Amino acid sequence: VSLRLSCAALLCALAAPALAETPAYGPELEGFDYGWPVARFNFETQRQPMQMAYIDVHPDKPNGRTVVLLHGKNFCAGTWDTTLRTLRDAGYRVIAPDQIGFCKSTKPERYQYSFQQLAQNTHALLEKLGVKKATVIGHSTGGMLATRYALMFPDETEQLVMINPIGLEDWKAKGVPAQSVDAWYQRELKTSAQSIRKYEQNTYYAGQWKPEYDRWVTMLAGMYQGAGKEKVAWNSALLYDMIYTQPVVYEFGQLKMPTLLLIGNKDTTAPGKDAAPPEVQKTLGDYPALGKAAASAIPHATLVTFDDLGHAPQIQAPERLHKALLDGLNALK
C-alpha cells in the first residue's frame, strides 16, 4: 500500500509543475509568438473601433494567386504555420487573419456575431490589401465562414477549399439542445490545458498525441489564464451561439466555384454534442457520411478523404494533407 501511495504522490508531484507552467497570455494573445510577422487592420464595425491581426506572406517566386486561410474555433492564424510555409514555397501569396473575437484580434464586450459579419470583415481586409480575387481555404469553423464568404462574394472567390469543416450538418435540427450564451460562458470559464488536450487528442488527432501539439494547447489555455480571461470566455460563448444558430449546410447547392473537400474520416466534431441525449449523440459527427453528403450537395465538388486522420489533418499529417491541397489547387490552372 505504501508503495502505491508513494507512486501516486510522485505522479501528482510530476503533474503539478505542468499545471503551474501554463503561461498567462493577454486577451489578444499578448506574449505568444506565431513565428511570423503580424500586421493589424484597424477599422470600425458596429460603432466600435476594432483591430484584426493578420499574417501576409509573399512568395519569392509568385504564381499570381492569393490564398486566404480561415482558422477554426479553437485555432488561430498561427496554427496555419506549416500550411503557410507550404503555400508560400509553392508560389502563393498567403493571408491568414485572426477573426474578430479570436486570438490576437479585438475581443469586444458586445458584438452581433454572424458569419456574414466576419465575411464582411475579411472582405474589408482583402480590399485594403488590394486583393481582388482569392482562393479561400477554411478549416473547422473556418469552413463555415469560407462557405458564407463564397456565397456572399462568388465573383471574388476563384476556388473554395474546406478542411474538415464543421457545419456539414445542422446540430439544432438533429436534436442538440440549445444553450444560452450565459451557459456557454460558464462552460468556457472552466477551460484548462488539461481539458483542451483531452478534447484535442480524442477529436483532432484520432487518439494520438505528439509533443509538437502542446504548443497549440498552451496557446489556447494561456488566454484563459490571463487577466482578460473573462473577455476571452465571453467572446467564445458568443461565437458558439453563432455556430449553433447559423447553419450553412442548406445553401451548399448555391456554391458556384470549384470546391475541394479534404476530410479526415476519424473526426467526430459536433459542437454541443455532449449536451445531447445519447441516442442523438450517436448520429452526430459522422464525417465519412457527412463528407460524401457535402460533395453530393455542392455542384463542383471534389472530395479527398483520409481514413486515419482526425479533425486537424493539416497538423496531424501535414505532408499528406498538403500534397492533396496543392494537387487540388493546381487542378484549377
Cite the ranges covered by each PLM segment.
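N-terminal signal peptide c-region/cleavage motif recognized by signal peptidases
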Residues: 15-17
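N-terminal cap/lid segment of alpha/beta-hydrolase-fold proteins
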Residues: 27-57
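Active-site loop/oxyanion-hole signature of alpha/beta-hydrolase fold enzymes
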Residues: 44-48, 55-61, 99-137, 141
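Conserved HGGG/HGGXW glycine-rich cap/lid loop of the alpha/beta-hydrolase fold
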Residues: 46, 50-104
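Flexible "cap/lid" loop of the alpha/beta hydrolase fold
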Residues: 147, 151, 158-191
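Conserved alpha/beta-hydrolase catalytic His-Asp/Glu region
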Residues: 191-253
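Conserved serine/cysteine hydrolase catalytic core
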Residues: 225-296
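Catalytic active-site module of serine/aspartate enzymes centered on a nucleophile-bearing elbow/loop
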Residues: 288-333
